[in-house]
Amino acid sequence: MTPTHFTISSAFLLGMMGLAFHRTHLLSALLCLEAMMLALFIALSLWSLQLDATGCSTAPMLMLAFSACEASAGLALLVATARTHGTDHMQALNLLQC
Amino acid sequence: MHPTTLMYTSSLLLMFAVLLYPLLVTFTSLPLNNDWASSHAKTAVKSAFLISLAPLSLFLSTGMEAVTSSWTWMVTTTLDITLSFKFDHYSIIFIPIALYVTWSILEFATWYMHSDPLMNRFFKYLLTFLVAMLILVSANNLFQLFIGWEGVGIMSFLLIGWWHGRADANTAALQAVLYNRVGDIGLILGMAWLATNVNSWDIQQMFILSKNLDMTLPLLGLILAATGKSAQFGLHPWLPAAMEGPTPVSALLHSSTMVVAGIFLLIRMSPLMENNQTALTLCLCLGALTTMFTATCALTQNDIKKIVAFSTSSQLGLMMVTIGLNQPQLAFLHICTHAFFKAMLFLCSGSVIHSLNDEQDIRKMGGLHHLAPFTSSCLTVGSLALTGTPFLAGFFSKDAIIEALNTSHVNAWALTLTLIATSFTAIYSLRVIFFVTMGTPRFLPLSPINENNPAVINPLKRLAWGSIFGGLLVMLNINLFKTPVLTMPAELKLAALAVSILGLLTALELATLTSKQFKVTPLRTPHHFSTSLGFVPAIIHRQIPQLSLLLGQKIASQMVDQTWLEKTGPKAIANATTPLASATSNMQQGLIKTYLTLFLMTLVLVTLISTT
């Protein structure tokens, strides 16, 4: 595995582990989500450079646009959670689970 | 212009002017004096009658007929309509008779409606009706006839509902309008067919241009129009219900003039029907059914006006039978003679009703032969004329019709029904006379029996002269268009007289049984059938609105609105998706951390396995 491949994969995995093992705050989960998106962005940008494939040059921009939408959706959910549950503690979201 | 035609046209113009002048006076804002009705309206009709005798005498002496076309009304590319009057055998003889009868009725109405505060309006309506009827009778094209047709229909509505505070009167007026409207559909169908296929509404042009065409459809339309206006079976309930109007209205409209308009239309259009066997058979069977059914209903009615109304309906059926025998002139003769005695019967009923303080039930009358002798005598004369007593007015037309019926190749069932109806005529006429004039009084002692007013006596006298001599006078002075069959077996010749005498004897026998209890448990079903008018109004007047309402509910509301536009459209998507969505959200328990951890671990495993 090349060092670049290893770096990006491990960055992605670390972000995902942060998303999966979050304990208290929803905001930290959203930050890890952003980290995953960042890793994917760098990967896509390096793709066209390393492989000399100019056809995929626009892919990182698209990726960035969609990640911005997703981040804003996540933040809206955070605000809604804060309004309905009072905090963004993860334990609060499970209270009415059946 | 030929002097005879000039005489005809100027007489009709003068008649219209004389009749319209009192009406125009009412349109100014001057208040009418109290005896406007007797001084203006009745005098106008009397003058119009005297004027109409001039064309009549000219026609009787020369036999000349005329058609006058004057003002061009509409010119379209294909159809011209002009103001056109036909002075033929039918209109010249009918107009004086109608005016004579109307004169008598108006004079009677000055006494009958004396206490009504709106008497002047009543006379105005009657005059308007008369003008519309004259337009109908003298019309030479179907457009003008239609104007008269609708005019008489509207005036009938206004006059039947004269006492509009009474719910039954309003119902009866509405029935008259609705049933006449159904008939009007037939007339408009006939007119439309003729306008599009024969390209004319003029009577002369229609007859010539339709020689080789198949006229079944327009003839069916015209027969439907006659069924509606002349109360044939199927569209008949309005005529007995129309007795809610005052007695002069019943006498004028619903015995002599308006209800014969349908028959008159068929008589005018008879050259179209001569060769169409379907139309003739339909007229015959419809007329026979009508005359039998209504005579049956008349047997057990207890309201004197209803009995006379059913009698009118039965005679109208007889006229329809005559048209079905291809004898329009005999039907016309019956119209003329029937006008006299039927109007007189209604006026006698009116006199009796007012004398007994507005009592109309014959079970509460009796003994009027001594108390109101003149009225009873006129009632008897009228009933005898109705049953076709030899040499009174009704005999000449009715006997001629029955003879023609017996000697032609005709449906035996129609023949039987007509003969039975003739015998029923004798039965219910005797019933009326028995209950009203014979026996002992069954009414309250202080009844205002007074027939000494000349406004009552003179009309009855005039109509009595007409009932006795009218048939003879008309028959002596006309030429029959079709040669009648003059030789027949004696049984056929005497058939009408025999069945009438048979009916009379049966009725006399039944009359003597009224004071004895003949049967311990009487047979009530036929009586119920007859008294409830064959259950036709009870069924039809409820069934048709119920069907319409059901149709509205089932189709408009339930099928279209609720089903197609709601349940299968927008709501279907919602109803299908909601269970799916709730099932899915019930499945997801919300344990995000567990789901993500599992996802991560599988991802790590995949990575490790793929790299090693």
UniProtKB/Swiss-Prot annotation, chain A:
It is a multi-pass membrane protein. The chain crosses the membrane at residues 1-21, 26-46, 59-79. It catalyses: a ubiquinone + NADH + 5 H(+)(in) = a ubiquinol + NAD(+) + 4 H(+)(out). It comes from the Eukaryota. It is found in: Mitochondrion membrane. The keyword Mitochondrion applies. Its main location: mitochondrion. GO terms for biological process: ATP synthesis coupled electron transport. InterPro entries: NADH_UbQ_OxRdtase_chain4L/K, NUOK/Mnh_C1-like. Keywords: Electron transport, Membrane, Mitochondrion, NAD, Respiratory chain, Translocase, Transmembrane, Transmembrane helix, Transport, Ubiquinone. Disulfide bonds: none annotated. One of its GO terms (cellular component) is mitochondrial membrane. Its EC number is 7.1.1.2. Gene3D superfamilies: 1.10.287.3510. The keyword rRNA-binding does not apply. GO terms for molecular function: NADH dehydrogenase (ubiquinone) activity. PANTHER family: NADH-UBIQUINONE OXIDOREDUCTASE CHAIN 4L, NADH-UBIQUINONE OXIDOREDUCTASE SUBUNIT ND4L. Core subunit of the mitochondrial membrane respiratory chain NADH dehydrogenase (Complex I) which catalyzes electron transfer from NADH through the respiratory chain, using ubiquinone as an electron acceptor. Part of the enzyme membrane arm which is embedded in the lipid bilayer and involved in proton translocation. Belongs to the complex I subunit 4L family. This is NADH-ubiquinone oxidoreductase chain 4L. It comes from Gadus morhua. The lineage of its organism: Eukaryota, Metazoa, Chordata, Craniata, Vertebrata. The gene is MT-ND4L.
